[in-house]
């Protein structure tokens, strides 16, 4: 008997279903937000101390407006621009303590990876049940994310084997695809 809580999807109607990772399969938004907050608050506090200007922390509005769902370095640039701050670009190889777009982005990534490894990531059980139901109906399932850490998240949650295809920030960079719009 079909699950009444799941949409009636048949292989005759769909070849595959693509799920977004962040906010659909896993609650990584909380982990991302905490890592961004720690990164930017540390930077902004140091900047305030050095310039004598008041410290104004990174907010939930800042997270949603400037960094959520974007490639990491785009998020750094957009947030800093919102505060009138211009930093050197740096590079993807910039050390996480470097005062640059690359350095701040890499610092956020170090903090996020530490949190995922230490604390894990919450999974939305209803979505996982739906994925299993799709498999039972022989419908292919893929996962998409702008994150370069999709594999880390899937492995931390034990979900990696549920997906036949994965398109993420690593694939985006490899193929030169644009990220989500600013």
Name each region found by the language model.
Residues 1-8:
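A short, compositionally biased domain-edge/stem linker segment
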Residues 10-21, 25-125:
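N-terminal helical cap/lid subdomain that shapes the substrate entry/recognition surface
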Residues 14, 131, 162-164:
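Core-facing hydrophobic residues within beta-strands of well-ordered domains
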Residues 31, 71, 129, 148-152:
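Short alpha-helical
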Residues 36, 76, 127, 150-154, ...:
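Hydrophobic packing residues within well-ordered alpha-helices of enzyme cores
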Residues 126-137:
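Catalytic-core regions built around general acid/base machinery
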Residues 139-142, 148-182:
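Substrate-recognition "cap/lid" segment bordering the active-site pocket of phosphatases
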């Amino acid at each position: 008997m079909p699950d009444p809580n799941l949409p009636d999807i048949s292989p005759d109607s769909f070849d595959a279903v693509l799920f977004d990772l962040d906010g659909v399969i896993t609650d990584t938004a909380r982990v991302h937000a905490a890592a961004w907050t720690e990164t930017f608050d540390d930077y902004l506090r140091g900047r305030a101390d050095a310039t004598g200007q008041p410290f104004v922390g990174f907010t939930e509005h800042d997270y949603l407006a400037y960094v959520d769902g974007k490639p990491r370095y785009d998020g750094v640039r957009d947030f800093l621009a919102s505060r009138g701050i211009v930093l050197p670009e740096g590079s993807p190889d910039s050390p996480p303590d470097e005062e640059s777009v690359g350095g701040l982005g890499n610092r956020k990534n170090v903090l996020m990876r530490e949190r995922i490894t230490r604390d894990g990531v919450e999974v939305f059980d209803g979505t996982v049940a739906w994925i299993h139901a799709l498999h039972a109906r022989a419908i292919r399932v893929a996962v998409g994310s702008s994150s370069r850490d999709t594999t880390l998240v899937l492995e931390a949650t034990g979900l990696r084997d549920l997906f036949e295809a994965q398109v993420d920030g690593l694939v985006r960079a490899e193929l030169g695809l644009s990220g989500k719009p600013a």
